[in-house]
From Swiss-Prot:
Organism: Clavibacter michiganensis subsp. michiganensis (strain NCPPB 382)
UniProt record similarity statement: Belongs to the universal ribosomal protein uL11 family.
Subunit (UniProt): Part of the ribosomal stalk of the 50S ribosomal subunit. Interacts with L10 and the large rRNA to form the base of the stalk. L10 forms an elongated spine to which L12 dimers bind in a sequential fashion forming a multimeric L10(L12)X complex.
Gene designation per UniProt: rplK
Protein name: Large ribosomal subunit protein uL11
BP GO annotations: translation
Protein role: Forms part of the ribosomal stalk which helps the ribosome interact with GTP-bound translation factors.
InterPro entries xrefs: Ribosomal_uL11 (IPR000911), Ribosomal_uL11_bac-typ (IPR006519), Ribosomal_uL11_C (IPR020783), Ribosomal_uL11_C_sf (IPR036769), Ribosomal_uL11_CS (IPR020785), Ribosomal_uL11_N (IPR020784), Ribosomal_uL11_N_sf (IPR036796)
Keywords: Methylation, Ribonucleoprotein, Ribosomal protein, RNA-binding, rRNA-binding
PTM comment text: One or more lysine residues are methylated.
NCBIfam families membership: L11_bact
Length: 143
C-alpha cells in the first residue's frame, strides 16, 4: 500500500456546473494552496457537464505535493427549491410575504435528491428539512 499523502488544505466552493474558470473566486482560492487551476477547472467541467445550469458544491482536498482530489456534492436545497417553485429568489421577508407554493410531492422529490448530503435517517426526516428550508425562503408548503 502506498504511503498516505499529507493533506495541506480543504477548500469548499459552490460553482455553476460546467462553468468553472480561473477567474475569481476559483483562481485565488486554489492559487493560495498551489493547485494547478486549469487542471481543476477542466476536471470539474468534465464531471459536471451533464448537470449544466445547477450550482454544484465541491470539496477539494489539497495534498503536500500540490495534487488534489475533489468530491462533488448535491446542489444546495435552496437552489433546488427555487427551480421547483419557478422563482428567481426567495422572499425578502419570508414570514409576511410568500413568493410561491410547493406541493409535498415536490418537497419529497427534492429530499430524495438531497438524501445523501442531509443529516437525516429516512426520507420523511429529509422532507421535513427541505420543507423548513422552503418556509425560511418564503415558500408555502402544501400538505
Amino acid at each position: 500500500m502506498a504511503p498516505k499523502k499529507k493533506v495541506t488544505g480543504l477548500i469548499k466552493l459552490q460553482i455553476k456546473a460546467g462553468a468553472a474558470n480561473p477567474a475569481p473566486p476559483i483562481g485565488p482560492a486554489l492559487g493560495q494552496h498551489g493547485v494547478n487551476i486549469m487542471e481543476f477547472c477542466k476536471a470539474y467541467n468534465a464531471q459536471t457537464e451533464a448537470q449544466r445550469g445547477n450550482v454544484i458544491p465541491v470539496e477539494i482536498t489539497v495534498y503536500e505535493d500540490r495534487t488534489f482530489t475533489f468530491i462533488l456534492k448535491t446542489p444546495p436545497a435552496a437552489e433546488l427549491i427555487k427551480k421547483a417553485a419557478g422563482v428567481a429568489k426567495g422572499s425578502g421577508t419570508p414570514h409576511t410575504v410568500k413568493v410561491a407554493k410547493l406541493t409535498m410531492d415536490q418537497v419529497r422529490e427534492i429530499a430524495e435528491q438531497k438524501q445523501a448530503d442531509l443529516n437525516a435517517n429516512d426520507i420523511d426526516a429529509a422532507a421535513k428539512i427541505i420543507a423548513g428550508t422552503a418556509r425560511s425562503m418564503g415558500i408555502t408548503v402544501e400538505a
